[in-house]
Amino acid sequence: MDRVLEYEIPSEYDGANITTVLKQHFKISTNLIKDLKKYKEGIQVNGEHKRVVDLVAKGDVLKITIRDTVSENIVPTDIPLDIVYEDEDVLVINKPSNMPTHPSMGNYENSLANGVMYYYKSKGEERVFRAVNRLDKDTSGLMSVAKNSYIHARLGEEIQKKELKRKYMCIVCGDVERDGTVDAPIRRADGSVINRIVAPDGQRAVTHYRVVKRYGEYTLLEMELETGRTHQIRVHMAYIGHPLVGDWLYGTEDHNIAKRQMLHSCYLCFTHPITGQIMEFKDEMAEDMRAFIEKLS
């Protein structure tokens, strides 16, 4: 599905070439500029097709059309979605636990991507599924989905620049004495596709945690990610001796205690790439985590 953006050229870009405007104002990547050049409607000024080397003048209207296709390898599946926010560019969804973000081997039709593609199809929209902040299968809560490649790239830049803020609530084993930060590099474990470990040759990973309440053998924490490595919170908390309750991979699996790792994405904040508005979303703790806490109280 096409996304059309228009911009009236101000005096600061009077006499500039289109490439300059695309990169400085729209912050469009070189790869996306190449895509825009492939079709006539990609770049227009005052309704006429233009090249990126052409110059613009104050008062000109620059229009770009971002063309999208459809994720043909993702089967649209009628899965109920808890949509927290939606506009022309972004979806914010409250993902339940026991639902992977993407399809995988042996699970082709029951992921969030399948549900989102069905939702797009029901609205007559052809789009590619583009998750911005991916959540693990058994992690619940807020996550964002970009509706086109431009928004996906811009929000990805916000993550790289640490401008997109994410906070989580989790329940860990043991009595965590005080707030703290784990700054420990993470990499994939040798011989494993899934398992991650702390290792000197890993990628830098930083997790901040705050004690919300202690329950003797367990502690409720608020987590804030400075980086976004796979399984980062789970790996870091296990590394300091406080694995997440119910984490079968990095802690102890006991379905009598918890059926999944007690981790919920409760806060998401980013700057909207089109409007410049600060988008802030909050969600309370997941119901199963709340029930677990109530049993401890």
Predicted regions and their residues:
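RNA pseudouridine synthases
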Residues: 1-297
